[in-house]
Amino acid sequence: MGGVANLAEVRHLRPVPDPKPPPKLHERGEVKPSIRELERWATVLRLDCVRMLAVAKSGHLDSSLSAADIVAALYYRVLRHDPERPDWRGRDRFVLCKGHAAPIQYAALAQHGYFPLEDLMGLRQIGSQLQGHPDMRRTSGVEVSTGSLGQGLSMCLGICLALRLDGIDQSAHVFGLLSDGDCQEGQTWEAAIGAVHFGVTNLTAIVDYNHLQTDGTTEEVMDIGDVRAKFEAFGWDAVEIDGHDMSHVVESLERSRTVRKPVAIVAQTKKGKGVASMEDRFGFHGKPPSPEQAAEAVEELIERLDQQTRELHASESGGGEG
């Protein structure tokens, strides 16, 4: 229990000096966080997730870690959003279709000021705004209550059509983050057909394809095959990337805004990415880390954060770009 208590005390995630905070929406303009900055923020989000799960003693850590690079790129560089105006009409919408990975979204929202960082330690507690799956009625910044696999892409499509009715579908983009499990559900593919049928041009579906599920590998549970080819067959523009290569992640997300049809980004990822003892290993889905595992993971991530911060400061001092 000592490990958990120690984790709970490390609330603000500042073991080393932070680089510049993310610019406000109206200040972004041409100034965007560099790849190095985004990689560092992904580590911060991973550290948040480990701490949350260690205290909650339940949740889906490995599924959150696999999505950290994608979520960091979205919230710190790609999404048009404003914590001071969470209901701003012209904002982009992000739907965490794989709602069991709620900790990674909560971490990004807290780091942006949608709610206090301290609230992260209330994950899955009675009365907390941070439940095991995102709840749009409780949590600022959550667009849709998700968790039932297969329904997320349909909700993304519905939002796109609503934005069209409101006349803002040419400016507000909808991003949905799906899992292997989402792609095993027929409703996902009905939505894929519908998006092309209705001529949606402001929808990007990112598949966090980490190949592991509760009972085994995705291929063993229900093989979903060539996901990129499936989306292409339904008329989507589809690409496959390394979901942990920040340059590839950013490039594909920013490109998706310019394509005049629905875009699918199939991101090859590893469950538990960033924590050596959990990375690409079966058995951590829906299982919290032990106090010892959590303490080891925190130490590993803080060391990486320290190194990334020093490299970032060095590149800024030398005028280099990461």
Regions found by a protein language model. Name each.
Residues 69, 100-101, 210-211, 245, ...:
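Glycine-rich beta-alpha junction loops
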Residues 106-108, 135, 187-189, 215-219, ...:
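Short acidic, glycine/serine/threonine-rich loops at helix termini
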Residues 3-9, 246-322:
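Glycine/aspartate-rich loop-and-adjacent alpha/beta segment that forms the canonical ThDP
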Residues 52, 64-190, 196-197:
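Cofactor-binding active-site loop characterized by glycine-rich and histidine/acidic residues
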Residues 47-58, 76-80, 110, 114, ...:
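Generic secondary-structure signature for well-ordered alpha-helical cores
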Residues 141, 145-148, 153-257:
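Thiamine diphosphate
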Residues 2-39, 44-115, 322:
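HDAC/HDAC-like amidohydrolase catalytic core signature
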Residues 95, 204, 240, 264-266:
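Structured core elements
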